[in-house]
Structures are given as structure tokens and as C-alpha cells.
Regions:
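Beta-lactam-recognizing serine transpeptidase/beta-lactamase-like catalytic domain environment
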Residues: 62, 203-208, 213-216, 256-308, ...
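Cytosolic-side transmembrane-helix boundaries in multi-pass membrane proteins
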Residues: 601-602
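Periplasmic/cell-envelope proteins involved in peptidoglycan metabolism and beta-lactam response
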Residues: 1-280, 303, 383-393, 436, ...
């Protein structure tokens, strides 16, 4: 019996080892499996090109360019000549040691980046020499190549995945790139494509010797899907040019579709600054600009009092609730008086009907309208509840649900706010009368106010604003961008509002913005402007606000312009909006002197005033 036992044990052990090796090499070849890494298989990724990005007219905005990273797999590093490698990579020994330790901390068996984005010259020099350093290799990747210097806030940028993203999403490995902002982030899963994979058999010295299974399991990379945006890059670039040396935002929307034609945040930034080895340095410079804040997308994030443009929303609510008609007349006499206070007005007329109230932006008219809407119901709470619901139906006070980064919701006051502020039953329409003229507690973002104009252009409905028109040459399949959202206002009430806005353009507060051959409905605006600097509250020059739709007969563009510290609406925002409309509808700007005034207009001195430690004046 004993003479058979030893051979049996040897045979059994051999069979177990063979079966184990067979299992590991054939069935358990996932790249995240340490067993394969230890024994026989090397996984090499072939990175795809990201999808190209085009504007609405088919102009290519973003393509790709090759870049090369020096990678390390710590478990494969052997017999390392640190000084020679540091010399080749132009790294100090301390810097190299730190990078290598971080790679080990991440994973001893997965690749990590040691040097990002070699130049083509450095790559040519290092390509052959890297073979002598076991565990190190050069990985080709695709970086973005921007064919435009505009729309940085729209396009966004890509950067290396961070530790949190590596833990959250197993698709990514250290050193890989991901959309970080803008369209690059929002449409990452469409743009990134699919990595190709190659498996190599390794010998006992850990060197790749042949394709595993003759490449039967290998896959080719699949390029990301192309995107066609809704923006007109010519209009976008023109808007950024007009907003040079100014802070604020321009949003232009096609009312019939909700497609965003331009999304200008100023100051803007060149997206190509965030590509290449200087990306980190350039990002830091942009981030540290505490006054201009070019990385802060004002079109989506900045919450401003809408000022007088909000009067048209109050007028629509008044018409819907039956508290006014287009023929309703209110006296002005220099302002609206309430409880020993006066809300001043500069319309210059003793009394106004609705159309003149809009055209001349009469504060008294809209204060009376607002008070009636709030107080003529069974209680002010009921009136306020209805008012809040009407305002929110225009997309205000909430996220619009666009395909852009989330942004901010703005603010629409409600009964809970005033019950908390004044006490239940202890307030009425005059307690918050500033809401009548777009100040008080109400706040909007530029994209929200442009969307209000789109809803007015459509006489009661809007499409959710969106930035992508086609994915992979097919119309976007998202129903939320093709189904209209209706306001609570009956369509019949929009005609007098549009006529009043047209009067503002022809003979009222917006008359300076007239364009030959284009009939516009417009509304100017401004609001008081307070900020805190080092804990001290101070008042600055008012913002310049302007909204419009054009042409009146068949609106093709709805626009909102905010210019911080620009003073009154017709001073800066109005001219900029009219130039944008002219550019879009005519394809060219013919008012060259008017254009030159806006191009040369700088408000940098206004933005520095609160930080110079000197006495200053406002609204000059």
C-alpha cells in the first residue's frame, strides 16, 4: 500500500496545480484580478479618441491630439537606476520618489502616471530608452485640441480622474481622463468611447512574449460619439468680444425649440489653456482670479435681482387674475406711496395704461398691479400663493432641468417666507412691494430670464433650454427637450405685453437699441446692488439688464443680458443685446460706430472700487 501512496500524492498535487493554472489563465483573465498579474497575463489598454464636438452649423470646435504619459507598475519595477531615470525624465530624485510612492499607495499591480503629457520631442527621445527600465512604459492617450478660443464655459475641459472617481467608477484607472466641466462632463459617457484591450502572455522574467490566445480576446477601441451643439460659435464669439472688460452674462435661445444659441459668461476663458503640461498652472491662475472669476459660469450660477424685466411677469399675472386689463390706468406722480414711504419713478407721465406702463417702465403702475394681485383675494396669503405659482410656471425659482451643469435655482418668495419674517396674518402686498419691480426677495439667473422671454415669444410655453442638438448625427432622444412646458397664463394675455415691449423699443426706455429692418420687443432694467467686502456692506453701481425677443412677427431669438455695475439697462446691456440680435438675424453688424462704443467700453474700474480702500461714487 505504501509503495502506491507516494506516487498518488505526487500525481494528485500535480493535477491540482495544472488545473489551478488553467483556471487562472483561461477563465479568470479580468484586468482587476491579481492572480493573472502574478502569473502570466499582461493587460494593455488602447485608448479611443473622444467624440468630436461641432457647433449648430457643423463647424468643428473640438478634436483630439496625441499625448504620451510615462507610466509605472510598481510590482514590476526591478534593478532600477533611479539617477539615470530621473535624468531622462527631468525629475528630482525627491519628486520621483514621491510619485513612485503614490503609485504604490494606489496599487502595486495597476499602472499609475509618473510624468504627464510628454512633448513629441521628449517622446521621441524616451521611446527606446524606456525599455531598459522594467516596470516603466509610455502610454499614448488622446488629449483635446480646441479649434476655437471661445465657449470655454460651454465646452468645459477634461482632466485626470481623482481618487474619489476611481473608487466610484470601476471603468476608470489612474491616469485616465474624464470630463470635468461643461459639455465634456455632462456628456462624458457619450464622448469617452470604449477602451480597446490587448492581452499578452508573459515569460518567467515577466516580459511579454506573445498575444494571449493569438489575440482572440483582444478588442479594438471604439471612438466616442460626436456631438453637435445648439450654439452658433460665431454668435458666441461675438458675445464674448462685446463682454470684454465687463462682468456678466448673455443667454440667447431659439424660442421654437429651446436650443441655446449663445451662452456667454464674462470674463470668459480660452479652453485650450486647460490642455497640456501647463494645464495645472493655467487652471490655478484662472481659479485665483478672485475678482473676475472666469471659471464661475455666471449664466447658470449667478443669481441677480431681475429688476424691471420682471414687471412683464407681474403684468401677465395681473391680467390672468383679472385685477387689471390692458386699459387699466394708474396715476404715478413721481412714484408709488405706501405707509409713509415712496417707491420713486422717473417715467415722466402723470398716469399710464398697461402699454405705456411697460414702455416707460413705470414703477407706480406695477406696484399697484402687484398689490392688487396679492391683496384682492380672500387674504394676502391666498394672493401670494397664486402669485408664487404663476411665477414658478415660467421656470423661475427652480432648476430648469437643462443638459448643462446644474446651476442655481434662483429664488421666488412664498407665504412661508413672509409668515416667518412678519408673522402669520401680519403682512400684505405692501410689505414686500419691491417684488413688483423685480427686487425684494426675487432672484433669477441669466438663463432663467432668457427662458422667460422664450415663453413670452411663444405666448405661454417654453422648451427646456438645452445645449446639444445631435448625438452621433442623430437628433437627441431626450423627450424632456422636445415637449413644451406651459405657463399658467392664458395665451390671449401675451399680445398686450409684447405690444408694450415693442413700444419700449420704438419710443420708450429701449429706443436707443433700434436696428433698421428688425422689429423687437424689449425691456430695460436695473436694480440696487449691494455686496459685502470684509464683512462690510456697501452699495455699488447698479447692474445693466436687458431682455428682448425678435423679430416680433416671428421670434427667432430670445435674449437676456446682465452686465454687472453697468448702471441702467439702455446704457450697456441694451446695446449689447441689440448687436447680438443684429448679428444673428442679419449675419453682419452694420452699426459700426455703435459697435465700437461697446467694444471699447470697459467697466474694470467699477469692479476694483470696493477693493482699493478709497472713497468712490456710484451710478455715474
Amino acid at each position: 500500500m505504501r509503495k502506491f501512496l507516494l506516487p498518488f500524492i505526487i500525481l494528485f498535487t500535480t493535477i491540482v496545480i495544472i488545473l489551478r493554472l488553467f483556471f487562472l489563465q483561461v477563465f479568470y483573465h479580468d484586468e482587476n484580478t491579481s492572480g493573472i498579474d502574478n502569473i502570466a497575463i499582461e493587460t494593455v489598454y488602447d485608448y479611443p479618441e473622444r467624440g468630436y464636438i461641432y457647433d449648430r452649423n457643423g463647424e468643428l470646435l473640438v478634436s483630439n491630439q496625441p499625448a504620451y504619459d510615462v507610466m509605472v507598475i510598481p510590482s514590476e519595477v526591478k534593478n532600477l537606476d533611479t539617477l539615470e531615470l530621473c535624468s531622462l525624465l527631468e525629475l528630482s530624485k525627491a519628486d520621483f520618489t514621491d510619485k513612485l510612492q503614490k503609485a504604490k499607495d494606489y496599487s502595486r499591480k495597476k499602472p499609475s502616471v509618473i510624468v504627464h503629457q510628454l512633448s513629441n520631442t521628449d517622446y521621441a527621445v524616451l521611446q527606446e530608452k524606456m525599455r531598459k527600465f522594467e516596470g516603466f512604459y509610455i502610454q499614448k492617450r488622446m488629449l483635446r485640441s480646441y479649434l476655437t478660443h471661445n465657449a470655454g464655459n460651454v465646452l468645459g475641459y477634461i482632466s485626470e480622474v481623482n481618487e474619489w472617481e476611481l473608487k466610484k467608477n470601476p471603468y476608470y484607472l489612474a491616469g485616465e481622463l474624464i470630463g470635468r466641466s461643461g459639455v465634456e462632463k455632462q456628456y462624458e459617457e457619450f464622448l469617452r468611447g470604449k477602451k480597446g484591450v490587448q492581452y499578452f502572455q508573459k515569460d518567467k522574467h515577466n516580459a511579454a512574449i506573445e498575444r494571449y490566445k493569438n489575440g482572440a480576446l483582444d478588442t479594438l477601441p471604439i471612438m466616442g460619439q460626436p456631438l453637435q451643439l445648439t450654439i452658433d460659435i460665431g454668435l458666441q464669439a461675438y458675445g464674448e468680444l462685446l463682454m470684454q472688460h465687463k462682468h456678466g452674462g448673455i443667454v440667447a435661445i431659439e424660442p421654437k425649440t429651446g436650443e441655446i444659441l449663445a451662452l456667454v459668461s464674462a470674463p470668459s476663458f480660452d479652453p485650450s489653456l486647460l490642455v497640456g503640461r501647463d494645464r495645472s498652472k493655467n487652471y490655478t491662475a484662472l481659479y485665483n482670479d478672485s475678482i473676475g472669476k472666469p471659471l464661475y459660469d455666471r449664466t447658470l450660477l449667478a443669481q441677480y435681482p431681475p429688476g424691471s424685466p420682471f414687471k412683464v411677469v407681474n403684468a401677465l399675472i395681473g391680467l390672468q387674475e383679472g385685477v387689471i386689463t390692458p386699459q387699466s390706468v394708474f396715476s404715478c406722480g413721481g412714484g408709488y406711496r405706501y405707509g409713509g414711504h415712496i417707491m420713486r419713478c422717473h417715467c415722466g407721465r402723470g398716469s399710464n395704461d398697461l402699454l405705456y406702463g411697460i414702455a416707460l417702465s413705470c414703477n407706480a403702475y406695477f406696484a399697484n398691479t402687484y398689490k392688487r394681485a396679492i391683496d384682492m383675494k380672500t387674504s394676502s396669503e391666498v394672493g401670494m400663493e397664486k402669485w408664487t405659482a404663476h411665477v414658478k410656471s415660467f421656470g423661475l425659482g427652480n432648476f430648469l432641468g437643462s443638459d448643462l451643469p446644474t446651476g442655481t435655482p434662483g429664488k421666488v418668495p412664498d407665504i412661508n417666507l413672509y409668515n416667518k419674517q412678519y408673522g402669520k396674518g401680519r403682512w400684505n402686498g405692501t410689505s414686500n412691494i419691491s417684488n413688483a419691480i423685480g427686487q425684494g426677495e426675487i432672484l433669477t439667473t441669466p438663463i432663467q430670464l432668457a427662458n422667460v422671454m422664450a415663453a413670452i415669444a411663444n405666448k405661454g410655453y417654453y422648451y427646456t433650454p438645452h445645449i446639444v442638438k445631435k448625438i452621433d448625427n442623430k437628433v437627441t432622444p431626450f423627450k424632456e427637450y422636445t415637449e413644451p412646458k406651459h405657463t399658467t397664463i392664458d395665451p390671449k394675455h401675451f399680445d398686450p405685453i409684447i405690444r408694450g415691449m415693442n413700444m419700449a423699443y420704438l419710443a420708450g426706455t429701449a429706443r436707443r437699441t433700434q436696428i433698421d429692418g428688425i422689429n423687437i420687443a424689449a425691456k430695460t432694467g436695473t436694480a440696487e446692488n449691494f455686496i459685502r467686502v470684509n464683512g462690510k456692506r456697501m452699495q455699488l453701481t447698479d447692474p445693466s439688464i436687458f431682455v428682448a425677443l425678435a423679430p416680433v412677427e416671428d421670434p427667432k431669438i430670445a435674449i437676456a443680458v446682465f452686465v454687472e455695475n453697468g448702471y441702467y439697462g439702455a446704457r450697456v446691456a441694451g446695446p449689447i443685446a441689440s448687436l447680438m440680435i443684429e448679428k444673428y438675424l442679419k449675419g453682419e453688424v452694420y452699426r459700426c460706430d455703435f459697435e465700437r462704443q461697446m467694444l471699447e467700453k470697459s467697466l474694470e474700474h467699477e469692479y476694483l472700487k470696493p477693493y482699493l480702500g478709497q472713497k468712490f461714487y456710484i451710478n455715474q
